[in-house]
Swiss-Prot record:
It comes from Danio rerio. The lineage of its organism: Eukaryota, Metazoa, Chordata, Craniata, Vertebrata. This is Ciliated left-right organizer protein containing ZP-N domains homolog. It comes from the Eukaryota. Pfam families: DUF4556. Expressed specifically by cells of the ciliated left-right organizer. Disruption phenotype: Morpholino knockdown of the protein does not cause observable left-right anomalies.
Length: 432
């Protein structure tokens, strides 16, 4: 099977990392409605697309209208009636097309895409007081072709990779990874999640009909003096997605795991997961030099999290390193020799997230990038009060940021789940 055509006509199928899409003319949509009603044994109506997609989601299907009032039918590779045949995902649609008031004829449409390995699902973020750096694996399409990528900042500013300085971003490509870096005050947008504020990077790689997320968040300011560290993780599919696609898809978190500690809480909004961890459990310090050469101290921490979503078969592996500015004084109570001395209370916020806003100015120079590396361990135990049993996680030993041969553990780490019907948020926690 060859590469997909750049033009989209009836019967053409587009292949992405986790799903395939078929364009259907509005005059043939009645045939799709009848086919869905028959094969799913439900009453399919097109009046409310939101209600319809709620019905279809249990089978991995979705239907959307385009700007010309035609339709795009999306099928997850893990969806109902999708078969794996000779290395391809295949589903056949029998659509009725009326030719008169009294009858019609059936036409078959085959949706077929090459089976692929798990899409790139790791993101490595480095933040300090001045800059942000994001590293991800460079993706290929379903036919294993390399793509010519451009950068899209805030969905509207699109430049070639070699012209990234026009939007105040540095790009380095060291296969298999790509790293982007810029100053926080020029490329990040403020975002409010519940009662806390973070800074969001609205950046994607784009190529033809493909988009690939480089979106990331940095925590707000210096949190080293706070008892709790609040982090925001942007929810999205990590592989190739439809460029300019339908942004109303909501992913629901089914589990969260943190490598460094079992003591944390999480809540989610439509767009973000908010992770709250006792600062004393993760914070470390190291020596640094002032501009005059004086030896000072600075706080830093690293978090490795694994998120599982109900709507996807692939986990999201998220790593954040945050470094505070050099400081002459470090609070002695910020880091405990015994983490059990720290108090931690989980809570359920009652405020919903807003979309990130565009900052008014972005004109400052960039700082040089740093090559990242990953090493993390986690150990979990049984909790006699909750009955939660956890398995130890083996130590990761990697020389590259994204060593796909060493997947992180997907063990469950929760003991309770709270639900707030007024704000559609979930809070879960685990205590050692």
């Amino acid at each position: 099977m060859g590469s997909p055509s750049s033009s989209m006509t009836e019967g053409d199928v587009e292949c992405f990392s986790e799903y395939m899409e078929l364009w259907i003319h509005r005059l043939r949509i009645e045939g799709l409605r009848l086919w869905l009603s028959g094969i799913l044994r439900i009453q399919v109506g097109l009046v409310s697309m939101e209600n319809l997609n709620h019905q279809l989601s249990s089978c991995g299907f979705a239907l959307h209208r385009d700007l010309d009032k035609n339709y795009v039918f999306r099928v997850m590779y893990s969806g109902c009636f999708v078969q794996l045949e000779h290395g391809n995902y295949v589903i056949v649609l029998n659509l009725l097309k009326r030719v008169s008031r009294f009858g019609g004829r059936t036409q078959k449409f085959m949706m077929k895409c090459p089976a692929v390995l798990a899409p790139p699902n790791r993101e490595y973020i480095q933040c300090d007081s001045d800059s942000i750096q994001v590293t991800r694996e460079i993706p290929v399409d379903n036919w294993n072709n390399e793509l010519d990528w451009s950068l899209a900042l805030r969905g509207s500013l699109v430049v070639a990779l070699e012209d990234s300085s026009l939007i105040q971003i540095n790009v380095e490509m060291h296969k298999p990874n790509i790293t982007v870096q810029g100053r926080r005050d020029t490329i990040l947008s403020p975002v409010q999640v519940f009662a806390s504020e973070g800074h969001f990077l609205p950046l994607k790689l784009v190529s033809g009909n493909y988009a690939y997320s480089m979106e990331a968040t940095c925590p707000n300011g210096n949190t080293s003096s706070s008892n709790e560290t609040v982090l925001h993780i942007y929810k999205r599919r990590m592989g190739l997605t439809k460029r300019g696609g339908y942004q109303n898809e909501t992913l629901s978190v089914s589990s969260v795991m943190v490598e460094q500690t079992d003591t944390f809480s999480w809540t989610e909004t439509t767009d973000f997961v908010q992770l709250i961890i006792p600062t004393s459990y993760i914070q470390q310090n190291k020596e640094c030099l002032s501009q005059t050469g004086e030896k000072l101290q600075q706080n830093f921490y690293k978090i490795d999290a694994v998120l599982t979503f109900k709507e996807t078969n692939h986990k999201m592996h998220w790593t954040m390193e945050n470094t505070s500015p050099c400081s002459e004084l470090l609070k002695s109570h910020s880091v405990y020799d015994d983490p059990q001395k720290a108090n931690f209370t989980t809570h359920s916020p009652t405020w919903t997230a807003e979309r990130p806003e565009i900052p008014a100015d972005y004109t400052t120079n960039l700082t040089p990038s740093v090559s990242p590396s990953t090493t993390s361990t986690a150990l979990q135990t049984a909790d006699p009060d909750t009955g939660t049993t956890s398995m130890p996680t083996p130590q990761l030993k990697t020389t590259e940021v994204f060593n796909t041969s060493t997947p992180l553990s997907s063990q469950e780490v929760f003991s309770s789940t709270l639900y707030s019907p007024n704000h559609n948020s979930t809070s879960s926690s685990v205590h050692q």
